[in-house]
Amino acid sequence: ALYGATFYDVILKDLIPMIDRTFRTKTDREHRAMAGLSWGGHQTFNTVLPHLDKFSYIGSFSGGIFGLDMKTCFNGVFADADKFNKKVNYFFLGCGTEEQMGTKKMVDSLRKLGIEVDYYESQGTAHEWLTWRRCLKEFVPHLFKH
């Protein structure tokens, strides 16, 4: 499977149901979020974007979609900005100012399509834990506002 695609099935079919059985969770899409850092941010996109019927919050810290056309990737999920923006309660991308990952370029492409995305830059940090802790601090409060 391309880039470990079966891992996404494990998240959707095994991990999330196990969490819901083990902990007192709200199981509807309006209360489900996924975020990840670095490659985990990329995995977040691969898990969430094809399954917006299951998630309404998306966070990626130093992860992104690179080398793909934003309008056509993930079966064109970003092509209809109004539909995407209504479905997703909060969309967050963050990275460090010293990273060369192209996250800002991705944000600019998404905004050009009309996608509502919150962008954060961690000042003076690179692809490192301080960046991701700061991104988490910025992201998490939004999970409780909508």
Positions of PLM-derived features:
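Non-catalytic cap/lid and distal C-terminal segments of serine-dependent acyl enzymes
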Residues: 1-146
